[in-house]
Amino acid sequence: MMVFQSFILGNLVSLCMKIINSVVVVGLYYGFLTTFSIGPSYLFLLRARVMDEGEEGTEKKVSATTGFIAGQLMMFISIYYAPLHLALGRPHTITVLALPYLLFHFFWNNNKHFFDYGSTTRNEMRNLRIQCVFLNNLIFQLFNHFILPSSMLARLVNIYMFRCNNKMLFVTSSFVGWLIGHILFMKWVGLVLVWIQQNNSIRSNVLIRSNKYKFLVSELRNSMARIFSILLFITCVYYLGRTPSPIFTKKLKGTSETEERGGTKQDQEVSTEEAPFPSLFSEEREDLDKIDEMEEIRVNGKDKINKDDEFHVRTYYKKVSENRDGNKENSNLKFFKIKKKEDHFLWFEKPFVTLVFDYKRWNRPNRYIKNEKIENTIRNEMSQYFFYTCKSDGKERISFTYPPNLSTFFEMIQKKIPSFTREKAPADQMSAYWSLMNEEKKNNLKNVFFNRIEALDKKRSFENILEKTTRFCHNETKKEYLPKLYDPFLHGISRGKVKKLLPFQIITETYINIGLGGSWINKIHGILLKINSKKFEQTLEKFNRKSLSVEKKLSFFSEPREEKSHSDEEIQIFKILFDVVITDNNNQTLIKNVIYFHEINKSVPQWSYKLTSELEELEGENEENVPTEPGIRSRKAKPVVVFTDKESHNGIYTNLKDNQNFDQKDEMALIRYSQHSDFRRDLIKGSMRSQRRKTVIWEFFQAKVHSPLFFDRIDKLFFFSFDLWGLKKTILRNLMWKKKKKKIDKNEEEQLKRKERRRMEIAETWDSFLFSQTIRGFLLVTQSILRKYLILPLLIIIKNSTRALLFQVPEWSEDLKDWKREMHIKCTYNGVQLSETEFPRNWLTDGIQIKIIFPFYLKPWHKSKVQSSQKARLKKTKDKGEKNDFGFLTVWGMETELPFGSAKKKPSFFEPIFKELKKRIKKFKRKPFWVLSIFKERATILLKVAKEIKNWILQNLLFLKGKIKNISKQNRMPLFDLREISELNETKKDSIMSNQMIYGLSVQKKSMEWTNSSLSENKIKNLIDRIKTIKNQTEEILKEKENLTNTNRCNKPRYDSKIIESSKKSWQTFKRKNIRLIRKFFFFFKFCIEQLFRTIFLGIINIPRITTQLFFESTKEILDKSIYIYKNEENGEKNKNKKNTIFFISTIKNLISKKKIFSYDLCSLSQAYVFYKLSQIQVSNFSKLKAVLEYNICITSFFIKNQLKDLVQEQGILDYELKDKTFLNSQVNQWKHWLRSNSQYNLPQVAWARLVTQRWKKKINQDSLVLNQSLIKTDSYEKNKFDKFDNYKKQNFFEANSLLNPKLNLKKDYRYNLFCYKFIHSREKMFDMSIGIALDNCLVSSFLEKYNIRVIEEIGHRKYLDWRILNFLFIKKVNMRPWVDTKSKKKDSRTKVQNYQKIDKITKTDLANKKSFFFDWMGMNEEILNRRLTNFEFFFFPEFVLFSSTYKTKPWVIPIKLLLFNFNEKKNVNKKITLKNKGFISSNEKGSLWFYNLNKEENGLAGQGELESDNEKQRNPESVLLNQEKNIDENYAESKIKKRQNKKQYKSNTEAELELFLTRYSRFQLRWNCFLNQKIINNIKVYCLLVRLKNPNEITISCIERGELSLDILMIEKNFTFTKLMKKGMLIVEPVRLSVKNDGQLIIYRTIGISLVHKNKPKISKRYKNIDKKNNYDCFIPENILSPKRRREFRILICFNLKKKNARDRNSRFDKNIKNLTTVLHKKKDLDKDKKTLIKLKSFLWPNFRLEDLACMNRYWFNTTNGNRFSMIRIHMYTRFKIH
């Protein structure tokens, strides 16, 4: 029965779920929801129900309801029916139709009373009222829904259409659901109206019943039509606001460009720009200059290009061909002409369609704004997205990276050839065919690969085994190839850069170098476009076939297994399509000087992007090349002139422009922003604000623009929310903390923000209304005059006259002096001070502020000038600093600290008077109470005497008590005697403990006794025996008493007596133990306190020692390092060993946690000594050391054998388990095994120790490094690579030679690859990983160093700078060249800096002519003075090396001191450096910058030099050396810049340094310190005032006192250097994180540079110089057998794994693949035995299921980047998978 019930219940649930998820129910639900999207159509529906009555009213109601339902039905049908959707879905269509109709209906209803509304006839067809109501409701229902804030409800039906299969049923059910909801809504409205009519309470209202209000109600009924017309008008206005009206939008004056794209993504990329279409007309690279293929600029929309099909073929030609008879004929060129017959109606058709019906609008701008890095409309780094259908995974899908050329071509074919159709195969056949094709491709690739490997086993030539790249060849005999630029088989690095012609560049005669010949016709153009009236078959006969041959030496499909027969039609189509270019020798036309470039293109509208803002226009009014009209709306700003130079110019004007501007006055202006929200937010002109993010205004004055999304998070108005919690907090705060001083917290910050917002609102109010600034300006000037000349003099007269009446001396002179001191300075609207008399320009319209300096406050009396004491002086200065002696005048005559701020509190005139009165009253009150105070003093003396008498009596009583106690002690029991002894012991123990000094491990504790009593052990034993005897005696006495009581009682024992006895016994034992506990508790408590005291006392003792030692060590080491920077490391270590250290560490844990001062040689500690120390300490006290030894297992493993560890473990001293029992060869999971073998990502413990800021012991690291010296200094392959650099430079391996000598090129390529393979895993010797030293990871560990206070001194003497600290990027390419004589003993190194302009290729001649040298790669750490400052041209891809990338990969090339030489200005040494005074530098002489290396012993100069930039040569300035004398500290390098100043051109030292700093060295982000921004603005405001004053001294001093003028920012010195700016903290040099676009070669170069770890290898043998003679490619890398393209294809096909997706485990299949390949390659079974002789097969060659293979697929399929740049990164990512 239960089963049956559950079965029924389950069926019911499933049935309910099916019903709920059915199409009908979902449609009903969504249709019902759309009812709530209320639109303007409800206005007409409600109007018909409310207003119309009678028979005509009922008809109108029916027609309104019918029209309403019909309109909604049309909307639902438009979801399913595409033409109706297109007609109703276009927003402009509805706009154009709706707005005129709405306006007409509004005016028609508004002027209704003009028509005759008498008795109507029954002929309603003539009246057409009912039809109008029907049309109103029908049309308004088609409008967009707008009343609800979200239109999501109306769109739910559209959204669900994508999920629904039975669409028609869904549309029908949704309409029924909407109809049900509409009926319910109308019923509810009717019920509400009926309830209002029938409700007695409303009808019986006194107001309504009164005659006065009856008239109003009747008027309301009569004016109902007017109310609805007003609502209709609001609807019209709302639609006008929302409507994107393209007719009235502003078109930008700039060119709206149309970019003609015909190629792949490379058109848009800067680094690898390619031709858009492979053309055969340009065989040489120089032909690129002839082609303007990239852009066609349409100026102001004048060039209209065949917009019918949006395709065209562009041609450039110079002359029209002539035939031999002299008759002009261009029959072959007809298809190149643009049809101009359509121009007469295009002016009407195209603009009308574009303006009205194109919602994207041709003049709609995009948000691509010009940037330093981005010049184009679309970012070059972005992927190319083009949607089209394609076959993927055997199914037809939408591809988002479909080639646009292919789709364009396909559309052209479909339009021009109507019979061209595609047959769609079934989905099953497509997927099966796709899988079969991919399987066949995979098998073919696999067979080819195995065949190549088997050929290698047969010892064939390796060069012939490699797969060759294929190239297009169009002349087999001469072997003339297609240019690399147009060769589709070549990709990546072989492609060059396309040089674009400038816009509007005309093809001149010099470009016409094409030979005369037959008429060249593109056959695809001939097919698609009508050339002439000849038939297609006739033109085919005239084709002179000239096919393109392809050179393929080793192709995967070069030898097909079966010959396939092809039909004649296939051959003919093949000839037509693949013989792209044909010649027609029968043509009788002779072409003279004609050049044609044909290209299939599709016009793509390109939006304007090089826009400037209004602010940039204001800033660059005086500059050239600034567009006249800005394209971006900035925040409203006005230039406020703050200074005008009225002096006449006496200079000589040589320029015409200067002569024209001679009469103009030089003005300095500041930009003033309006004090309201920026609703523009960089809005582009021509775009619509309605399409931006919603910026809703809900306040009259809104300080900040907000979106409605964040409406709940902002402070709302009072009627929106009532903050009870905030009110409660304020009440509690007022109750509890009235008298306490409040601290600055978040609430006060909020108050300040609220005040600032209030101030901005007031400013916005004055700035927004018309003539408000004029009114305010007049009021301010009036208030200023009244205050200065009327109110204040009147107050002075009243005050002094009252003083005279009160018989006091008047203060006329003091008051008048203060009155004259008050200044009313006119300021601009934002507070820039001008002067007392000068008004700002346009102050009536722009606004004005009046600032009062030294405001006059009326005082009752003036204090005497004689200062009474130092305290009064200090108080005066303090008050002066706190008081602000200025304020801004308000309209009401008040003062504020800030413009539009709250009124400032004035010092009260009567407050000092009241204070003085209070003082006088207090003095008067004190006189009657003098007698009482004297009496109080005498009473205290009497009390003291009484206390002394009392104390004397108490002492005597205590003495008598003591005597009595001594007498009673003689008869005391021995138990109390024992207590006395224990108390004595305690006191003695306390005295001993207080005098005991606690040291570290040097103090050896012989016993664990807690007392150090002077009693001997015998006495203690005797005492214990006595206690036992006493206890026994007492127990015997108690037993005897019990026996006596028992005998007196009955013989029969009772049950109650037993209970009583047991309770008595338990009570006695409890009492006894309680007494013992009470007796011993005091000593136990004292013992605990002593233990705590010991630990705390030890810590307190150690804290000052630790701090003092750290302080002394850090300061001493910093001083040592700063004085001896370039000293040898050995001397430094000797100095370290000589230091006097304070030994304060007590445990091994402290020794380990200490970072710098651990100089013990742990290896010298004998194990006997260690265990002797351990045996001396008791096990119970060993808990401190136990945790330390267990935590630091790796350290104890150095000096403790395993046997001794076991012994210690057995004794219970240490729970020790050997951590490193499982080595790498253990049988563990393969995945874990592989991860563990990846030592690149498994950081050593040294790195982790540095990360957690624990410095491990230096000696252990050195010992382990010494043990593994063979690993570092082996004659490995990487060491040999650098030795070959001389030979490499002599042979000049560059592009030209690489083409001539392919064998050397191949050899070089395999040396690179083999070097990377061997280097990464050349050191795989097994050693104890618990030591934490992994020699492969020196690079990682060196970069993971964190600087703290204790190691900060190491930064100064570091040999090289970590490039992660400062990121260098050169604006121009800098070529650093060495001039170093390695044989000479002079320690002179200078580096030459040259500036080149941006060029396409780095020239190779300068590189080749360099002096060949061997870069001392491994000797940089030994002696810094011998190091040359060179830019080592790395032998991997030397053409692509820049200085910045070189420094990033090899930061040790230039030390810090030489790199940042410009900031190391010292004035300690009196050694002066002077430069050569040369008159001029010739233009042929190359300027150089020399660095000075100062030797400490010699104090001599290393070199002298000068600098001159190419940019200065172009401007031809003749600089004069500034006679500066700079003192340079020892061991620092500094550059001197030689500048010669021209008489015509004056440059300060600051400008010269700024120019040098920004243009030559590196790009930094120079930002001001954040707190200086307001200071600088305040300084500028004060400067504007001081410039106008004749005697500015007093104002300057007062401004400095007030803090308005900060002296650190004043540029007092003329020669103000960057060093001083940086020292003051004004200028901060930060590294710039710029997005640098690197080409592929640079990425590969940097990837290889990661693996080249810098090691200390000072010497390299000369016998490796002839390393080039060795055939390194004999030890091949299997991945390079296949070409990169086939490699990727093979990997992707393997990843698909078409048939065996779930057949086996991935790891097993992976292992099998590896084993099969390794058995073919190497017949030896074990790969791990001899690692030096075998080249290991890397598992990354076959990444079946690795992460980066997915990235490769992404690049291969989705066209994110070009070329195979992931292979070099993969080298370092994965290691060989071990096979056991």
Curated annotation (Swiss-Prot):
BP-aspect Gene Ontology terms: protein transport
Protein name stated in the entry: Protein TIC 214
Domain of life the protein comes from: Eukaryota
Additional detail: There is a partial copy of the N-terminus (positions 1-344) of ycf1 in the inverted repeat (BAF50422).
Topology term for the membrane: Multi-pass membrane protein
Biased composition regions of type Basic and acidic residues, renumbered to the chain: 254-268
GO CC terms: chloroplast inner membrane
Source species of the chain: Draba nemorosa
Oligomer status and interactors: Part of the Tic complex.
Function per UniProt: Involved in protein precursor import into chloroplasts. May be part of an intermediate translocation complex acting as a protein-conducting channel at the inner envelope.
